[in-house]
Each structure stands twice: as structure tokens, then as C-alpha cells.
Amino acid sequence: GVRDILILCADGLSGIKESIAAAYPNTEYQRCIVHQVRNTLKYVAEKDKKAFANDLKSIYHAPNEESGYERMQSVTKKWQEKYPNAMRRWEENWDVLSPMFKFSAEVRKVMYTTNAIESLNSVLRRLNSQRSVFPSDTALLKALYLATFEATKKWTMPLRNWGRVTESCQLCMMDDLFSIYFYICIV
């Protein structure tokens, strides 16, 4: 079973941070940046979305937390008059948006988003919508296994710089340098 979780990247589901902290106290909770950006852009007019999104990118592409925070303040100041509420959640949630800055650039690129697991969840939801009743638990497990197996056939692109990512994560896991338990989860 899982012995430790280095990073949990999730959307803003209430209670997830506290639940994970209770079971795995050393886990870094990271709010999904892609979800944060999407939620922010809901407050922005269509004509300004591209420019606003580029400004947001400057925050999460910053080299360190201090620079990211300064860029967040700069983006807030720039757009405050036109979109006074757009950046409010960034400021309120900075503590769960900034943990990524503790990791290397390679690791950050992996943890920005939960899209990979969301894609798998989509496959599993489709299975559920096609067939809402299963004759037994075993039938359900077999269907889930086959759907997952089929989904993995599409996973042809390796993660960029995966060697460096695992190396960085191993260095973060001080108590067990020989095995890595790196989970990026969405709930």
C-alpha cells in the first residue's frame, strides 16, 4: 500500500487538505493551477482572456515563491480596476497555490495540473454512464480494469524530463531515498 505521498494536486474540494494531512502529515497539498486559472478567467471578458491568462502564467512560471507572489500582486494591480474580484482567490489561496515553488521546474510542470487523472476519470465516468447496473462486484471490477487498460494504450507520450522529476522527488523524500511514492491525485 501507499506509505507516503509527496504531493497531492487537487482542485478546491473542501476538506481534502485536512483529510490528507490526517492520514499523511508530510504531504504537500497543491491546488491545481489549471483549475485556478479557469476559475479566474470566469470573471474576465472574452476580449481580455488571452492577455489575462498570459499574465497569470507569469505567476506560476516564476522562478521562486517570492517572485511568484510579487507577480501575483502586479497582475492584481494591473487588472484591479477592470476586474476587481478576479484575483481575490489567488490572494486567499496563496498558501495552497505556492507549494509548487519548493520543487524544481521539471516537477512543477508535472504538478501544475490534474489533467492526466481527469482524463482517466472521464473514461471511468463514461463506463458508468453506459452501464449503471453491474451484476456483481467482480463484474464492476473487471469493467473498470478493462476500461483502464484501454485508456493506457493511448498513453504514448512519456513525461518530459521524467528522470529529473523522479530524481528531484527522491531528494525530497528524506526518509526513503530508494523508493519513490509520487502521486498526483484528484478527488
Regions found by a protein language model. Name each.
Residues 2, 20-23, 33-34, 117, ...:
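Hydrophobic aliphatic residue packing
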Residues 1, 12-15, 118:
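Glycine-centered flexibility sites
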Residues 7-13, 19-55:
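Conserved beta-strand -> loop -> alpha-helix junction used to position metal-binding or nucleic-acid-contacting
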Residues 4, 28, 108-111:
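A generic hydrophobic-helix recognition signal that picks specific residues
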Residues 1-7:
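Short, basic/hydrophobic alpha-helical segments
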Residues 58-187:
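Acidic/histidine-rich catalytic cores and adjacent linkers
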